Amino acid sequence: MNLNSIPAFQDNYIWVLTNDEGRCVIVDPGEAAPVLKAIAEHKWMPEAIFLTHHHHDHVGGVKELLQHFPQMTVYGPAETKDKGATHLVGDGDTIRVLGEKFTLFATPGHTLGHVCYFSHPYLFCGDTLFSGGCGRLFEGTPSQMYQSLMKINSLPDDTLICCAHEYTLANIKFALSILPHDSFINEYYRKVKELRVKKQMTLPVILKNERKINLFLRTEDIDLINEINKETILQQPEARFAWLRSKKDTF
């Protein structure tokens, strides 16, 4: 399997997973034009689309792509039924695409129906987890998002986090505002800054490394707890997550 990315809009990535025969699955095509261009250039044969949630920048290109490739199956949660999904999927489902088994799990928070697709080592997590951050809570609660992140955090160390936006630099700046002396975060900041100066993408990221630099995955880390305790005493990791998310919302 080969992982490819197509830039879209200002900071989106549309992921395309291909096999050796050129058959492919397209993840969250927010617009069709760049996908059609890449398909023509690489002579890919689209077999399926994965949708993680219903937001327009993730589903906007589905109907046009289906006009060109009507044989495709479009997998998505119930909230994407009116956005082009032809096969509804949910928590615990498994599907076979490109000869590989993908496991679905619900990750409510950003939206209530958000799902992720996992076939080791690839995790297509939409707007649930970003490098250095997590999605805004447009529909769900902090508790729901925390539990969703813990599902991701339980995956193998070598999981490749294929999220949908290039938010890494801004997220790491936020992390440094909370833990300015953290060596891992500072090192990652230098690396990410250099990549972005060169207009290079910072994704995908390996979960093992993400656990070191993403504060939203470190809610039981003593350094972070001590920092939060300077402002407020929060006993539960979910409460510390909510505190972080609130801080990020106004950063």
UniProtKB/Swiss-Prot annotation:
Protein name, UniProt field: Hydroxyacylglutathione hydrolase
Reaction equation(s) it catalyzes: an S-(2-hydroxyacyl)glutathione + H2O = a 2-hydroxy carboxylate + glutathione + H(+)
GO MF: hydroxyacylglutathione hydrolase activity; metal ion binding
Family membership: Belongs to the metallo-beta-lactamase superfamily. Glyoxalase II family.
Cofactor: Zn(2+)
Cross-referenced Pfam families: HAGH_C (PF16123), Lactamase_B (PF00753)
GO biological process: methylglyoxal catabolic process to D-lactate via S-lactoyl-glutathione
Enzyme class, UniProt record, top EC level: hydrolase
SUPFAM superfamilies reported for this sequence: Metallo-hydrolase/oxidoreductase
Transmembrane segments: none
UniProt subunit comment: Monomer.
Organism, scientific name: Salmonella gallinarum (strain 287/91 / NCTC 13346)
Pathway(s) where this gene product acts: Secondary metabolite metabolism; methylglyoxal degradation; (R)-lactate from methylglyoxal: step 2/2
Amino acids binding Zn(2+) 2: 57-58, 127, 165
Record's keyword terms, sorted: Hydrolase, Metal-binding, Zinc
